[in-house]
């Protein structure tokens, strides 16, 4: 079996027969050059599963789930509340934090926040790709913008670790 892992948003179970969406089918067939009969991995909150390609029709891959590789796991909740920064750096933060195990991203609005709009579709794509590459089973969530005072008030009984580059300690 190859090391190709894809996130599958629908429920997975043994002997399930389903189809990949167009971008995932394109990735497997045209980029990774996988053919009928070959295997790859699918994962989501149901765990990680081995799937075998049954058919490739008009560029869409139909597969069957043949084996459970890993059960789902309960990760510790690690949230990253952040004030959005310029695009390239934000993409890197999202990618690396996903690889390190963050389970939820919360963009925070402060008085000095310059970036006030996020491309959620793009960030979710980065989150999924980082989850695929880092062997995670759960894909972190991306919340809507929250004002700093609202975030702090709603999380008063939560341990918050604050990082500030401008302090000595």
Q: Model-flagged regions — what are they?
A:
Residues 1-71, 121:
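N-terminal positively charged helical leader segments and presequences
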Residues 166:
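Carbohydrate-associated surface elements
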Residues 169:
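Short, glycine/charge-rich flexible loops or terminal/linker lids adjacent to PRPP-binding catalytic cores
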